[in-house]
Swiss-Prot record:
Family: Belongs to the iron/ascorbate-dependent oxidoreductase family.
Residues binding 2-oxoglutarate, per UniProt: R274
InterPro entries associated with the record: DIOX_N, IPNS-like_FE2OG_OXY, IPNS-like_sf, Iron_ascorbate_oxido_reductase, Oxoglu/Fe-dep_dioxygenase_dom
GO molecular function, a single term: 2-oxoglutarate-dependent dioxygenase activity
Native source organism of the sequence: Arabidopsis thaliana (Mouse-ear cress)
Binding residues annotated for Fe cation, in chain numbering: H206, D208, H264
GO cellular component: cytosol
UniProt EC number: 1.14.11.-
Protein name per the record: Homoarginine-6-hydroxylase 2-ODD-C23.3
Highest taxon in the source lineage: Eukaryota
Subcellular location: Cytoplasm, Cytosol
Needed co-factor(s): Fe(2+)
Length: 332
């Protein structure tokens, strides 16, 4: 990150990028060029930005949250019917306090979903994540709604990443040649109970470890916070109909450190329950992630001797999961 945060995170209308998303010559379009410039500044300065003009209706985005609220309102015993276990590939419902960040319990519950893959496809590393996503019977049609939402988020993430690739000086498809022939994804449907005291950590400070994250948060509660260069926590105030987008550790590596993944956390000081749906767009599960050649040439360690180690995404993910759900592993 090159500069400090502004008073508000940037709001970027990506509609020109969406219109031209499949045009190999999109970089020549003036509207796309403007969007690309804004993406570049946002990724360098903050690592976080709002996305509007994305083409997904506000009503649909809201319905995803409304039906998620309905699930979390169910009796605990009902939610446990899709309980997360290591045997289920870490897919399903997790109770409040099961998730650990930096070794401390987080005050949230969730449904965790991952891209499904065939048994044996990713060898021993992928074996611990094999299994089908667990969906509740109630609310009805929730599975169908969320599967459609996943498809839309995949398309949106791909479009944003094409703009970022242009911002870094590559072709729109720079990342897609090797790293995204079969992109992995994660979705976390998160519920944060209302609290009667301040500064209860809903989710501890962390960076995301994939490429891009799309955050769909309740419109009427401010809980997500991003840390600036001075060490201050900046509230990410909800904007109806928008997504909050941030870059993750894998994009930091691929870009040769030009873009920095940013620490963020969740503190729900509201007495009301909060829902947030996080979609995480990743590389191929078996991708060996290191700075792409074009970015090593254009940004050789940002003028330093910094070298980013090669990381196999799936190994990185499994290690993070087993650390996050340490209690689950120990008592399984």
């Amino acid at each position: 990150m090159a500069t400090n945060f502004k008073s508000l995170l940037p709001v970027i209308d990506i509609s020109p990028l969406v219109v031209k998303c499949d045009d190999a010559n999109m970089a020549e379009d003036a509207g796309v060029a403007e969007v690309v410039g804004k993406l570049d500044r946002a990724c360098r300065d903050a690592g976080f930005f709002y996305v509007i003009g994305h083409g997904i209706s506000e009503d649909f985005i809201r319905k995803v949250r409304v039906m998620s609220h309905q699930f979390f309102e169910l009796p605990y015993e009902e939610k446990l019917k899709i309980k997360i276990t290591p045997a289920a590939g870490y897919r399903g419902y997790q109770r409040i306090g099961l998730n650990l960040t930096n070794g401390k319990q987080d005050m949230h519950e969730a449904i965790d979903c991952y891209k499904e893959f065939k048994q044996g496809k990713h060898g021993d590393i992928g074996k611990v994540m094999e299994g089908a996503n667990q969906w509740p019977e109630n609310p009805q049609e929730y599975k169908e709604l969320m599967e459609e939402y996943i498809k839309l988020c995949i398309d949106l993430s791909r479009n944003i990443l094409r703009g970022i690739s242009l911002a870094l000086g590559g072709s729109p498809y720079e990342f897609e040649g090797k790293m995204l022939t079969d992109p992995f994804w994660i979705m976390r449907i998160l519920g944060y109970p209302g609290v009667n005291q301040e500064n209860v950590i809903g989710c501890g400070a962390h960076t995301d470890y994939g490429l891009l994250s799309l955050i769909n948060q309740d419109d009427d509660k401010t809980a997500l916070q991003v840390r600036d260069l001075a060490g201050d926590w900046i509230p990410v105030i909800p904007i109806p109909g928008s997504f909050v987008c941030n870059i993750g550790d894998m994009l930091k590596i691929l870009s040769n450190g030009v873009y920095e993944s940013t620490l963020h956390r969740v503190i729900n000081n509201s007495p009301r329950y909060r829902v947030c749906v996080g979609f995480f767009y990743e590389t191929n599960f078996d991708a060996a992630v290191e700075p792409l050649d074009i970015f090593k040439e254009k940004y050789p360690g940002k003028g330093t001797s910094q070298v980013f180690k090669r990381v196999v995404y799936g190994e990185h993910l499994v290690h993070k999961l087993q650390t996050t759900f340490q209690n689950l592993v120990e008592h399984s």
